A protein has these predicted regions:
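N-terminal amphipathic alpha-helix/helix-capping segment at the start of soluble metabolic enzymes
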Residues: 1-5, 114-115, 119-131, 342
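Conserved, mostly hydrophobic/aromatic
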Residues: 3, 34, 41, 72, ...
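Shared catalytic-loop signature of beta/alpha-barrel
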Residues: 221-238, 243-341
Length: 371
């Protein structure tokens, strides 16, 4: 692999409907797109999913752009002709954390690599299926009745797994209402670190609900308190923000801190580390699913590819193109079928290309680099 040109775009898309989590209300998604060109005319695209403010982790749109432009782009050119994306990922391991910045380049390299091989990205990664199941992730509503109406809308579209964001005061009474209304649907909750061990009795009560999992109930950097909580409740804990690397996953599993892992490609630094995590965890009986970052079309394509790996066993936060945004920055758009399944394109790369007119419409700044 040899990179001849890099194009970086800072972009912004407004949500169709504001999305509320325990962190607050979000009305737009700021992100960046990285295009890598080789001398044969192939192009690979990756997305940097860091938000404009550091509410999910320490990275921001501006900070990640700095790392990409000042460190990752020069490293791409300095590397010359290298073997594959995994070589470059390990070659740039000297860059501490900044995983969302690194993920944007890693994903772009994987698409470029698979195009050079002439095969779909999911096959290049080692995927074992050509379709995935999507779930829907719902923000916090003002009342249980509003949540029930929202769930009904998405179930009518074919979704079978529903994830509801929760925070203190907007939790068990909401989920009881959901269970009463919809019976045995696949139901899970995501706390985004809104609770502490002082809330252990609440989580014991949640055992009665038969939840698929409780995602990241405690602190975002914790695996010790989660160990104590998991030992006290029947419902599986799924770790999200606590797992940034394969070593984090190993430690959490050895402690018994979780039974499931949400692997977000952006959070762990790209497709390489996601593949490593699912393999290590899966071989120990801890299965995974692909989480999302209210993703654009570029990020969604890579998420679809990684979700075909063998130890991804739960429905994924990979909705159709029309879930979050009015405009899709890639073509073709993605839609779920009546069974909440999404078919992956049998084309080199992710199978999606930038919709140039839409991309230009939503581009705030653009940079080009050549060696």
């Amino acid at each position: 692999m040899k990179i001849s040109k890099v194009v970086i775009r800072r972009m912004s898309l407004d949500f169709k409907v504001p999305f509320r989590t325990s962190f607050g209300l979000n009305t737009r998604k700021d992100f960046s797109i990285v295009e890598l060109h080789d001398s044969d005319g192939n192009v690979g695209c990756g997305a940097c999913s860091a938000f404009w403010r550091p509410w999910y982790n320490e990275e921001t749109t501006e900070g990640a752009l700095f790392v990409i432009k000042e460190f990752l782009v020069p490293s791409l050119f300095d590397a010359g002709d290298f073997k594959d994306p995994e070589w470059f990922f390990d070659h740039t391991s000297w860059i501490r954390r900044n995983r969302m910045a690194r993920a944007s380049v890693d994903c772009a390299l994987w698409e470029l690599y698979s195009k050079e091989l002439g095969i779909p990205e999911y096959k290049a990664l080692g995927g074992v299926r050509n379709e995935i199941e999507a779930g829907v992730s719902l923000g916090i509503e003002d009342t249980p009745d509003k949540l029930l109406k929202t769930i009904e809308k998405y179930m009518n579209q074919g979704y079978r797994r529903v994830k509801c964001k929760i925070k203190p005061g907007y939790d068990i009474q909401y989920m009881r209402a959901v269970r009463k209304e919809f019976g045995d649907i696949m139901l899970m909750v995501d706390a985004n670190s809104a609770y502490t061990l002082n809330d252990i009795d609440l989580f014991k009560e949640m055992d009665e609900l038969g939840l698929l999992m409780i995602e990241q109930p405690l602190a975002s950097d914790d695996i010790v308190d989660h160990r104590h909580l998991q030992a006290a409740i029947k419902t599986p804990i799924c770790l999200d923000e606590s797992i940034d690397s394969v070593d984090d996953a190993r430690r959490a599993i050895e402690l018994g801190s979780c039974r499931i892992i949400n692997i977000k490609v952006a959070r762990v630094g790209g497709l390489i580390e996601a593949r490593r995590i699912q393999k290590l965890a899966g071989e120990k009986g801890v299965y995974s699913w692909c989480g999302g970052m209210v993703d654009d079309g570029v990020a969604r394509g890579h998420n679809m590819a990684v979700a075909t790996l063998p130890y991804y066993r739960y429905p994924n936060d990979i909705p159709g193109s029309d879930r979050y945004y009015a405009d899709d920055i890639v073509t073709p758009s993605t839609y779920i079928d009546s069974h909440a399944k999404i078919q992956l394109p049998d084309l080199p790369g992710t199978g999606f290309e930038l919709n140039r007119a839409v991309v230009e419409k939503h581009t705030i700044e653009k940079w080009e680099f050549t060696k």
